[in-house]
Amino acid sequence: MTIREKLQTVKTNKKYRTFILIKNKNNEKLELVPLTFQSMIKDKLDQEFISFKKEIEHYTKETVLTFVI
């Protein structure tokens, strides 16, 4: 299973309240995943990915942290 597939799978689980929004450098939304999924993302993607902006946005009244990759 690819990372993208894993992200999609977790994203569809509605029980989470805090999410990570992953964007590319063009500010396009790539994925939205639960905060609890953060460690798997850090383990699997480049270390540059960890230059993680703690930008807080609102996504359907939920807290969203933004990563730019």
Regions found by a protein language model. Give the residues of each.
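Detector for the mature cores of small, proteolytically processed
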Residues: 16-69
